From Swiss-Prot:
One Pfam family named in its UniProt record: PX
The family this protein is said to belong to: Belongs to the sorting nexin family.
This protein's GO CC annotations: early endosome membrane; Golgi membrane; retromer complex
Source species of the chain: Cryptococcus neoformans var. neoformans serotype D (strain B-3501A)
Protein name: Sorting nexin-3
Length: 144
């Protein structure tokens, strides 16, 4: 909604819900397993009013390998959109389960999802984006 110059914003203009919004937060990393079977997953909380999404509010857990598969599928599904890279893999001699490494990866995954989910073509036309963000039973094999 355009605002006229010199006229102060009304309360409704300042605090009303935007026409369409999509908010994503990656939080609450959890490490599971023992030894070589250890992995970390992250909670993805999504709030939206975009009709392409089935739920207004959702929370799912995903691990890094899920993000890798999601990115590959998204790249194939959306050939007209440049999909950003994921945060890099952890170096061999780095403890990938240290708090610092987990937080750096969480921040990188957050940036990745903000860019991807912020793209108008993907927001409204990507079935895999909606499923990845909202379906707790999401499985890459459904999309390959």
């Amino acid at each position: 909604m355009a605002r006229m110059a010199g006229r102060p914003q009304t309360f409704d203009e300042m605090y009303s819900v935007p026409e369409s919004f999509l908010e994503i937060e990656i939080r609450n990393p959890m490490t599971h397993g023992i030894g070589r079977k250890m992995y970390t997953d992250y909670e993805i909380v999504c709030m939206t009013n975009i009709p392409a999404f089935k739920l207004r509010h959702s929370a799912v857990r995903r691990r890094y390998s899920d993000f890798e598969a999601f990115r590959d599928i998204l790249e194939r599904e959306s050939t007209r959109v440049n999909i950003p890279p994921l945060p890099g893999k952890v170096r061999v001699f780095t403890n990938r389960f240290s708090d610092e490494v987990i937080e750096q990866r969480r921040e990188g995954l957050q940036r990745f999802l903000e860019i991807v989910a912020g793209h108008p073509l993907l927001q409204t036309g990507s079935k895999v984006l909606c499923a990845f963000l909202q379906d707790p039973a999401w499985d890459k094999s459904q999309w390959i």
